Amino acid sequence: MADPKGSTSKEGLGDWCILEADCSDLENDFEQLFEQDADSDVSDLLDNGELEQGNSLELFHQQECKQSEEQLQILKRKYLSPKAVAQLSPRLELMSLSPQQKSKRRLFAEQDSGLELSLNNEAEDNAPEVEVPALDSGPVDEGGTGDVDIDYLALLRSSNRKATLMAKFKDAFGVGFNELTRQFKSYKTCCNHRVLAVYAVHDDLFESSKQLLQQHCDYIWVRGIAAMTLYLLCFKAGKNRGTVHKLLTSMLNVQEQQILSEPPKLRNTAAALFWYKGGMGSGAFTYGKYPDWIAQQTVLGHQNAEASTFDFSVMVQWAFDNNHVDEADIAYQYARLAPEDSNAVAWLAHNSQAKFVRDCAAMVRFYKNLQMREMSMSEWIYTRINEVEGEGHWSSIVKFLGYQGVNFIMFLAALKNFLHAVPKQNCILIHGPPNSGKSSFAMSLIKVLKGRVLSFVNSRSQFWLQPLGECKIALIDDVTDPCWLYMDTYLRNGLDGHFVSLDCKYKAPVQTKFLPLLLTSNINVHEETNYRYLHSRIKGFEFPNPFPMKSDNTPQFELTDQSWKSFFERLWTQLELSDQEEEEEGEHGETQRAFQCSARSANEHI
């Protein structure tokens, strides 16, 4: 019979297995087995003495602290992990509404490898923190309404409060908050107009604010949509951001972090239309009339039609009527007129403002110069003293002349010939020692008559006498020997009252007569033989006494415009000045019409 498959009989090879399988006759119990193992040839291998506790408690304490720290890190990573978004998507980690500052302390301890890295609490975390708000609908507190508390909690959980408020504002009103406002970085900058977006205001406080704000504002625009409330407030007085926030937080019972506050855009037509159209709807509450910056950009009228074109002649007429001759004065005063004058608004909007100012000043000077030349000295004095406001007394001038020992009758006669420019009598010299009031007396007369002062320091220029053709009276103060020599050499003909050739800048020399010239000097020219040819051409008066002062260091004699006004009015007849009431009437008894230099007709409707 064949052998079973898979088995092979090999005799003679299995004896060793039988021998190894024989059981040993040695049967020992466990105690004998341990006793035999304990026997050793090495002495003192085992220490059978009593054991001490050692540092096992400290080791156990360290193990417990390590385990607690690991559990705490697990809880932090579970509930407040700033890297949860980073683990989901690297792109989502980089998305942020505002830049995040680096944390100063570590929220999560690093894996300690024996270098005690976990103890370094002030190391900076280079990874940006992205906080994930959990907007779950939890139970609301019992102290307030559910909707307000949910909105407020959503605001608190957001990482960027301002961006969240702006997003909710745009969702509610359909326009961005920055599109209606301009940015004020400082909290101390005052402004009369404010745009405020307040989040989560109670309905009762919202309604009451419409009445409470009326005592603080001239204009109120209020509208509430969902949890967002929008205010446009035009305060009666300028307020800074901190003051406005303090007012709203106390009135609406909200926190400052629920408020966005910026001034409105005043020159943006789209923003003005937003307030204008929003105020016409039923959902908005308004109080007061529209502010000027809204009305000018939305309300159509004849002012808007005229403001688009600038009339240069109107500007010249305004400067002429108000006696504005200086370029800086014209520019500043006409700019201040813009809120009231449409032509000034058009001038401000023009690109050639400086050119118009220069041309306006030049035209006014042309008109004023010719007007002055056509006036007699009587008309000029009458015009100038009528511009002086207030009342004075002419006796102050008479008393001062008496104090200086001047014969008033002789002075009055010399002044009469001086004002009428009588040949060889149209120059008066006031001489005397220093600090005797010579310059104060002469300057007060020049000031009230709008004269010009000549300075000999400019005598090296051939145009230093040009102001003589632009005034009715002139003064050379503190004449010294070089000036006397110049006058003796070149100005004899002018002092005689004859025509002279006067060189003017940017124009050909003009033919003119010397106007009344007043001089002050420490030198009595009548005692100088070197200038004997000037003796008959100059009338001199001496002021020998020092100018008197009161105990409070004010002049004892008031030489003011009001004093000279009273002086001329009192001595008008003695000075042989003409009656101005008769000169103001024409040949047929008609009053003279005021000068008009504008292009608008006199009969045109205003």
From Swiss-Prot:
It catalyses: Couples ATP hydrolysis with the unwinding of duplex DNA by translocating in the 3'-5' direction; ATP + H2O = ADP + phosphate + H(+). Phosphorylated. Residues 144-307 are annotated as: DNA-binding region. GO terms for biological process: DNA replication. Residues 581-606 are annotated as: Disordered. Residues 406-556 form the SF3 helicase domain. GO terms for molecular function: ATP binding; ATP hydrolysis activity; DNA binding; DNA helicase activity. Residues 593-606 have a biased composition (Polar residues). GO terms for cellular component: host cell nucleus. It is found in: Host nucleus. It is an enzyme of class 5 (isomerase). Pfam families: PPV_E1_C (PF00519), PPV_E1_DBD (PF20450), PPV_E1_N (PF00524). Keywords: ATP-binding, DNA replication, DNA-binding, Early protein, Helicase, Host nucleus, Hydrolase, Isomerase, Isopeptide bond, Nucleotide-binding, Phosphoprotein, Ubl conjugation. The keyword Heme does not apply. The modification Phosphoserine is found at S81, S89. Its EC number is 5.6.2.4. Can form hexamers. Interacts with E2 protein; this interaction increases E1 DNA binding specificity. Interacts with host DNA polymerase subunit POLA2. Interacts with host single stranded DNA-binding protein RPA1. Interacts with host TOP1; this interaction stimulates the enzymatic activity of TOP1. Belongs to the papillomaviridae E1 protein family. HAMAP family: PPV_E1. This is Replication protein E1. It comes from Human papillomavirus type RTRX7. The lineage of its organism: Viruses, Monodnaviria, Shotokuvirae, Cossaviricota, Papovaviricetes.
